Curated annotation (Swiss-Prot):
UniProt domain PRC barrel: residue ranges: 97-170
Cross-referenced Gene3D superfamilies: PRC-barrel domain (2.30.30.240), RimM (2.40.30.60)
InterPro entries (alphabetical): PRC_barrel-like_sf, PRC_RimM, RimM, RimM_N, RimM_N_sf, Transl_B-barrel_sf
Role noted for this protein: An accessory protein needed during the final step in the assembly of 30S ribosomal subunit, possibly for assembly of the head region. Essential for efficient processing of 16S rRNA. May be needed both before and after RbfA during the maturation of 16S rRNA. It has affinity for free ribosomal 30S subunits but not for 70S ribosomes.
Source organism, top-level taxon: Bacteria
Domain text: The PRC barrel domain binds ribosomal protein uS19.
Principal subcellular localization: cytoplasm
Example GO biological process: ribosomal small subunit biogenesis
Keyword line: Chaperone, Cytoplasm, Ribosome biogenesis, rRNA processing
GO function term, MF aspect, one: ribosome binding
Disulfide cross-links: none
Protein name in the entry: Ribosome maturation factor RimM
């Protein structure tokens, strides 16, 4: 990975599982077990130390994901890793399908209405379960359902622009 390459935060270590060095993970991928598909991982401890890991294996275990890191075989080592963040290089993710987007790619894009009224820039997104919502910050904060083509008319990465059919007063 190039030092300047964009990193994507996929999850974090939330605890130890058992006594053999297995770890409990929190994953923000969809589905959550997809975190194991994207490697190598760049792990960053709460103190800022970073290392690169390949060959991480894992499984679903009830409410948790359980991971096995190469060369970690004891609980004490795992407990010291609590809060460690898990990243991958953006290039490790496969291209999205047509009309699907990685949230991280949308963050920072400018948003304007079909009438050309500038609303601001994408701050972040969140899921409601039924659809995703894009949070746009400009003169004020707006939450717009990320629903194609009903509200989101186009996403143009070259123009750094999302066009929406949205009342600017709402």
């Amino acid at each position: 990975m190039k030092p300047t390459e964009r990193r994507i935060l996929l999850g974090r270590i939330v605890g130890a599982f058992g006594v053999k060095g297995e770890l409990k993970l929190e994953s923000w991928t969809e589905p959550r077990s997809a975190i194991f598909r994207y490697q190598p991982w760049i792990v960053r401890t709460p103190s800022g130390q970073e290392s690169v890991l390949s060959g991480v294996r894992g499984r679903d275990q009830g409410k948790n994901l359980i991971a096995v890191f190469p060369d970690i075989t004891d609980r004490d080592t795992v407990e010291a890793m609590h809060g460690t963040e898990i990243y991958v290089a953006r290039s490790a993710l496969p291209p999205p399908k047509p009309d699907e987007y990685y949230w991280v790619d949308l963050e920072g894009l400018q948003v304007e209405t079909v009438e050309g009224i500038k609303l601001g820039a994408v701050s972040h997104l969140f899921s409601t379960g039924s659809n995703d919502v894009v949070v746009v910050r400009g003169d004020r904060e707006r939450m717009i359902p990320f629903v194609l083509p009903e509200y989101v008319k186009s996403v143009d990465f070259e123009a750094n622009l999302i066009v929406v059919d949205w009342d600017p007063d709402f």
